[in-house]
A protein has these predicted regions:
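Short, acidic, small-residue-rich periplasmic hinge/interaction motif at the N-terminus
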Residues: 12-60, 90-92, 98
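Transmembrane beta-barrel wall of Gram-negative outer-membrane proteins
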Residues: 159, 165-188, 201-240, 263-295, ...
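Extracytoplasmic beta-strand/coil segments of soluble accessory domains associated
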Residues: 64-104
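C-terminal beta-signal and adjacent terminal beta-strands/loops
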Residues: 588-591, 641-651, 675-744
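Gram-negative outer-membrane beta-barrel transporters
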Residues: 439-444, 546-548, 567-650, 739-743
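Membrane-embedded beta-barrel scaffold of Gram-negative outer-membrane proteins
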Residues: 288-292, 489, 517-575, 697-702, ...
Length: 744
């Protein structure tokens, strides 16, 4: 446009006035234009920014740490990357990388054994997460979907990270006139810092290492070849020495002292490879064919003897023995032995397609999968209390020592011996239709789809068992043509989870081939309200949900180890509400507050409803980012989580109807302080910093309030009263970590 000119003239009659103005151009500064894609919101998918992963403090720095701050997602063990979603367990979550389903090791029983998550956060481009009500194109699990896309590099970049917990190197580049792109990452992790902060003195030598590669080659305008590979070697050498734990009340404190002998040596070797071909037939149709192989070889070997003394602590402040153990309530020992081996090979081939025409989209796919699992279990526990070997429960004999001698053989308190060979074949497919349009002036999205899954199980040369399920699913969303920016959505359907290896194996190690798929009839109502405060964007997301659960396979949880009854003898439900407010509480930095309310119960063998192991009634998560106003390169990050206690801590043999005690609430705050020397917004053309695309250094304070969290108990016996005491096994305390990041 041009600037306007206004000029007054005064003239006599018949005079001629010549005026030749030159208009000057004028630039009008428009307000910020925001282009929004509401498709993910309409699908109930939470999109997270990949760059946040690198800076959020957490014991496991990665995508899972970010997920724990979302409503409905919980984990009460900072050393584990596994998580529960809306009343589900760890095994009910789907994880995809570039459209390929990812599997985890099977034998891991504690968070400190896990090592690295499969997902290398430095290689991530996009993160999409759904806590329920997801579309038919995703697989057959009950709870959630985490859909990760790795980067396709555009130029050379090398990223190096190092801290007291380990380090990583990632290199990415393009070749062959940018037809070939490659990104390769190597990581190393050492959990010694966390394990040594516990109340158990140990000799601990963990070695968690993995290497990943993602290559993409554009053969032509229509054909692109991709390869995703992973190799992981986790070695866990653990030698406990002593333990001292005080617990109880102020007026009745107790102390447990344990002396250990023995060691544990575990090895988890996993390899994974996936080759895919994308074929862009035309502007409307895209086809993808993928071949995948996953192999895990796991060894869990340990012989650990423990001798303990449970004593009363003098709580009399005026006493000369104040704070000392004055009376022993229980003396005993136990020996734990394990020689467990597992070898699993999972291969599959699938074809997926997408057809788009105008505002219509059709997605379809078919998949065949073969699972071959060989498993050997040799695991037993002997408990001795004051010279008497404690026998297993409910063996139908009378032992009234010392009044009458008992001459029966010594038997382990727990004993599992099994050897299994398992072959599972699966055929699955899906078809779904999506459309965008209008109802009057209101924008709408809808999706309808169906999945089918057939599987056959052959265990230990027994007769093959065949089963088949169908899962219809649907979504509908509307964005009214209102002055306020609000989107409403509803989704639901039938979500079934066919049994995998762990669900088929009972407490005794026996494989039961006829276990049915667990089923959830799921309904989700949600809304997104986008608004502005302080001239900064905010969004309030609210969802309420209900799950009607049937064919439940009851389970118990010990740390991160899930043991199933291998019996579809329960029904249940899960209901709750999730609220998340995210926005720029500090200009230019997104933060959020999450609130989750949940209730989930189950009825086993019609004995009545009790809380499920994942019944976490309340969850609060806060992710806050800030910077120093006069020094904006100095940034602070706070990751705060509060989870109410869940039922747990019971002995492995306990009847859940007799043990509904809850563990203590999980409370944790991690603080990170980072200084950015240079990054994309602050580059140097000369000097030392000109060599870097990015250079950062910082400190992380984990569990900054040094709160004692516990997720399991050690059970010891009082010989005098025959009572058992649950001694909490505390997680990590306050830890300081130093880290540095470089990008070239």
């Amino acid at each position: 446009g041009f600037k306007s000119i206004s000029k007054e003239f005064f003239s006599n009659r018949r005079s001629i006035i010549r005026f030749s103005p030159i208009l000057k151009s004028e630039n009008e500064i428009l307000e910020e234009v925001v282009i929004k894609n509401d498709t993910k919101d309409a699908q109930g998918i939470t999109t997270l920014k990949a760059e946040k992963i690198e800076r959020i403090p957490g014991a496991n720095s990665g995508i899972e740490t970010l997920l724990m701050t979302l409503p409905g997602v919980s984990n009460n063990n900072e050393l584990s990357t596994q998580y529960n979603v809306r009343g589900g367990n760890f095994d009910e979550n789907l994880v995809y990388v570039n459209g390929i389903e990812i599997y985890r090791p099977f034998l891991v029983r504690s968070g400190q054994q896990e090592g690295l998550s499969f997902v290398n956060s430095t290689m991530v481009q996009n993160i999409n997460f759904s806590a329920g009500g997801f579309q038919a194109k995703y697989g057959d699990k009950l709870s959630s979907v985490l859909d990760i896309t790795y980067k396709k590099p555009l130029e050379f970049t090398a990223t190096i990270k190092a801290s007291l917990l380990g380090g990583s190197i990632t290199v990415e580049d393009v070749f062959l006139d940018k037809k070939l792109s490659a990104i390769i990452g190597v990581r190393y992790r050492d959990n010694s810092l966390f394990v040594n902060s516990k109340q158990i003195e140990t000799n601990f030598k963990p070695r968690f290492t993995d290497a990943q590669a993602f290559l993409s080659y554009k053969q032509s305008e229509k054909i692109t070849l991709n390869f995703l590979g992973n190799f992981s070697l986790n070695k866990y050498d653990y030698q406990p020495v002593t333990r001292r734990t005080r617990f109880g009340t102020v007026t009745d404190p107790l102390e447990l002292i344990v002396f250990y002998d023995g060691q544990e040596k575990d090895t988890y070797l996993t390899s994974f490879g996936a080759l895919s071909a994308d074929y862009q037939a035309n502007d409307d149709l895209k086809l993808t064919a993928t071949v995948t192989a996953f192999n895990t070889q796991e060894e869990e070997y340990f012989d650990i003897a423990a001798s303990y003394n449970l004593g009363e602590v003098d709580a009399n402040i005026g006493s000369q023995t104040f704070g000392d153990v004055t009376f022993s309530e229980g003396i005993g020992s136990q020996l734990n032995h394990s020689r467990n081996d597992l070898d699993a090979l999972i291969t599959n081939v699938q074809i997926r397609g997408t057809y788009k025409k105008d505002e219509n989209q059709i997605d379809f796919g078919i998949k065949y999968q073969s699972e071959n699992i060989k498993d050997r279990i040799r695991e037993w526990e002997i408990i001795d209390s004051v010279g008497f070997s404690i026998r297993p429960l409910n063996l139908g004999f009378i032992n009234d020592q010392p009044y009458n001698p008992f001459t029966g053989p010594i038997q382990p308190f727990q004993n599992i011996r099994a050897q299994n060979t398992l072959n599972i074949s699966r055929f699955s497919g899906f078809f779904q239709y999506s459309k965008k349009g209008f109802i009057g002036e209101h924008k709408v999205w809808w999706n309808i789809g169906i999945r089918g899954h057939h599987w056959s199980v052959e265990a230990n040369n027994n007769p093959i068992v065949h089963q088949f399920i169908v899962s219809p699913r649907a979504q509908f969303a509307m964005k009214p043509n209102w002055e306020k920016d609000i989107l409403f959505r509803i989704s639901g359907g039938v979500y079934s989870q066919p049994p995998f290896y762990k669900e088929l194996r009972d407490f005794e190690g026996k494989i039961l081939s006829n276990i049915k798929a667990q089923k959830s009839v799921h309904m989700v109502l949600g809304s997104d309200y986008s608004f502005t405060i302080w001239n900064r964007p905010f969004k309030l997301t609210t969802e309420v949900y209900y799950k009607n659960l049937s064919n439940i396979n009851p389970y118990s949880v010990d740390n991160v180890r899930i043991r199933y009854q291998a019996n579809n003898n329960a029904k249940g439900y899960a209901t709750g509400m999730d609220i998340r407010l995210n926005g720029e509480f500090v200009p230019g930095n997104e933060s959020w507050i999450s609130l989750g309310i949940l209730k989930t119960e189950e009825n086993i063998d019609n004995r009545g409803y009790i809380a499920r192991p994942s019944d976490q009634r309340f969850k609060l998560g806060i992710l806050f980012q800030d910077y120093v106003p006069n020094l904006p390169d100095l940034k602070a990050y706070l990751n705060l989580v509060y989870n109410s206690g869940v039922p747990g801590g019971a002995p492995s043999y306990a009847d859940p109807y007799n043990f509904q005690n809850r563990l203590r609430d999980y409370r944790r705050a991690d603080l990170g302080v980072l200084y950015v020397f240079t990054d994309a917004s602050k580059r140097f053309s000369t000097g030392f910093l000109s060599q870097f695309k990015e250079l950062t250094a910082g400190l992380e304070l984990f569990n900054m309030f040094d709160i004692q969290n516990s997720i399991t108990n050690t059970w010891v016996r009082d010989a005098a009263t025959k009572n058992q005491f649950g001694v909490p096994n505390y997680l990590s305390g306050r830890i300081l970590n130093l880290k540095i990041g470089m990008k070239f």
